């Protein structure tokens, strides 16, 4: 009985650990000037190595920022811009299971495709106020 309890406890610990680790989908690799993220109605200042999460709204002030996602997608956000990560799923073993949807709400963003686009370019969608770009 004790062994069963130990096994269940260990399984629950591993499950919750994976959930916590999966929140970060990328990191700030370059930061110059003011940049912040709106996350769950909180505004946080971004610095180099800050984590980026699903549904984040990344905003730049007078500076710019570079983000590298876990699939090796790189995004450079210019000053006075806003980028929302609407959807991000990365499964390196599935062409149809991965997806990246970004909304460039304001300003200029430079995108360099990573593994999601290499697996299936149709799974990348970049939206702007006036257009929609498929990779």
Which residues does each PLM region occupy?
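Bacterial N-terminal signal peptides that target proteins for export
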Residues: 1-8
